[in-house]
């Protein structure tokens, strides 16, 4: 498998180079040259595979021989070594709980897969270095925001040099508002040949999130920045552009622009589908369309799901549930893609004014706006509705949503109610014969076949102020993170300016 840059000005690379460098030299995101296509027979076999075996089958084409099968099987098994239950909330809306990993957030999957891949590559390079007196040069990765999701060019090779890997230890720089840093810290903890530096805004993460960032030790360093998340992110971006730092460090990113973090997010869509089929398939092999509502900020999560569908997984319609940061919602309504400064909301992980992964969604859909409108619906949910949804669902359905899940739940209700009036619908899929790219998922709200799942991306305990105010009760701390409460945070205070950060890096 080769990967090309969506900037169209860099040479193709393999998975290893794409994972280590993060972005292409032309600042574009990497995209697989081919989307694997699973046959109907393979899809049928996927119904009964265990999670680890299924994960291996899905990820093997993307890795493309850069990791041997035995090692990839181990990486996949360790990546998904926790539950992904599909839990009913109402008759028509189910929750895919993605918070049963070590840091209680969906980002555990991508972070664990990426960390183990980089660890594998580090050992591989170390072994190669021991047998060769000449080390390879390194082309430093460069990061930049994506300014437009629309590109009609086809991938081409250029004469520019291909990024090379090196035996120099990899340094992962991460700016976080909470969940990303915790997942990356846990995923990379103890990984040989990889150091992680996390920048987080002082006083702007929850107590549990901060403990997840600051109590790891070993190869994880937490910098407590006296500023905002935007300050942290700006410093990380400037570091990737700094030639002096890149001479000393082999820098890479661990957010969803990196293919090793983005692509494994497909896995839990397959896991959800397995459970869906087991629960709803009838004797003739038919089952309701699994419409999917995803809380969306940077659009990496929903993009991974759309990749799964493009590879042949029979999924229903996708709904992007957004907060006040509604760039994509407005784009679908107006065909005008207008980025803006991020707006602060109670669903803060979705506070993104320029979603970098949307360009990948457009690539999946051949950069065609009509294709986009057929494949994706989007709604913008206010903070007031988010809070009232948490309260209402807790009271009526005895289910505790986090703010991001509440945005998704509210969007799911809107979607199901809007399709209620549509007629001549087709809401049953035959998994063996249906063209799932053209499913018209329209059914009445009270029809048991009209259903949707929401992705519950984080445990509500990570957002105690919003959730506890809404439900009027304290949230029980899960045993998996309760041990953190007895730990002492270890962080390095840092001023919110790049000069201070660079000085610390070079000392």
Residue ranges and their predicted role:
Residues 1-130, 165-430, 446-507:
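PLP-dependent amino-acid enzyme catalytic core
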Residues 133, 137, 141, 145, ...:
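Intrinsically disordered, low-complexity proline-rich tandem-repeat tracts
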């Amino acid at each position: 498998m080769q990967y090309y840059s969506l900037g169209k000005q860099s040479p193709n690379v393999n998975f290893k180079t794409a994972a280590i460098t993060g972005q292409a030299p032309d600042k574009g995101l990497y995209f697989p040259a081919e989307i694997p296509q699973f046959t109907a027979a393979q899809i049928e076999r996927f119904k009964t595979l265990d999670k680890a075996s299924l994960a291996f089958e899905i990820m093997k084409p993307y890795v493309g021989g850069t990791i041997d099968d035995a090692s990839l099987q181990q990486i996949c098994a360790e990546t998904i070594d926790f539950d992904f239950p599909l839990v009913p909330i109402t008759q028509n809306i189910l929750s895919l709980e993605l918070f049963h990993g070590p840091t209680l957030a969906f980002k555990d999957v991508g972070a664990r897969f990426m960390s183990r891949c980089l660890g594998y590559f580090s050992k591989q390079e170390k072994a190669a270095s021991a047998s060769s007196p000449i080390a390879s040069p390194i082309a430093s990765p460069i990061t930049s925001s994506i300014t437009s999701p629309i590109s009609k060019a086809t991938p081409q090779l250029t004469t520019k040099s291909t990024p090379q890997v090196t035996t120099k230890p990899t340094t992962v720089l991460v700016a976080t508002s909470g969940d990303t840093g915790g997942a990356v810290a846990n995923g990379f903890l103890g990984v040989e040949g990889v150091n992680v530096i996390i920048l987080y805004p002082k006083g702007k993460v929850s107590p549990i999130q901060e403990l997840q960032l600051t109590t790891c030790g070993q190869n994880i360093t937490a910098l407590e920045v006296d500023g905002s998340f935007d300050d942290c992110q700006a410093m990380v971006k400037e570091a990737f552009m700094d030639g002096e730092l890149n001479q000393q460090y082999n820098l890479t990113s661990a957010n969803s622009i990196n293919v090793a973090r983005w692509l494994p997010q497909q896995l839990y869509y397959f896991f959800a589908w397995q459970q869906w089929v087991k629960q709803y398939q009838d004797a003739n092999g038919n089952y309701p369309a699994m419409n999917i509502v995803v809380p969306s900020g940077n659009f990496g999560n929903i993009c991974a799901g759309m990749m799964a569908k493009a590879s042949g997984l029979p999924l229903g319609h996708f709904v992007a549930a957004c907060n006040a940061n509604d760039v994509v919602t407005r784009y679908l309504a107006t065909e005008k893609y207008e980025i803006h400064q991020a707006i602060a909301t109670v669903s803060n992980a979705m506070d993104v004014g320029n979603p970098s992964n949307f360009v990948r969604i457009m690539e999946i859909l051949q950069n065609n706006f009509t294709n986009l409108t057929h494949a994706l619906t989007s709604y913008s949910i206010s903070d007031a509705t988010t809070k009232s949804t948490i309260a209402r669902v807790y009271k009526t359905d005895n289910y505790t949503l986090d703010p991001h899940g509440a945005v998704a739940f509210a969007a799911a209700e809107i979607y199901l109610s809007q399709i209620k009036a549509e007629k001549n619908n087709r809401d049953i899929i035959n998994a063996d014969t249906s063209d799932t790219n053209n499913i018209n998922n329209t059914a009445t709200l009270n029809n048991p076949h009209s259903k949707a799942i929401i992705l519950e991306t984080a445990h509500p305990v990570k957002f105690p102020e919003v959730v506890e105010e809404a439900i009027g009760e304290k949230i029980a701390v899960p045993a998996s993170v309760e041990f953190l409460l007895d730990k002492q945070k270890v962080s390095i205070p840092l001023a919110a300016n790049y000069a201070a950060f660079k000085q610390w890096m070079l000392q």
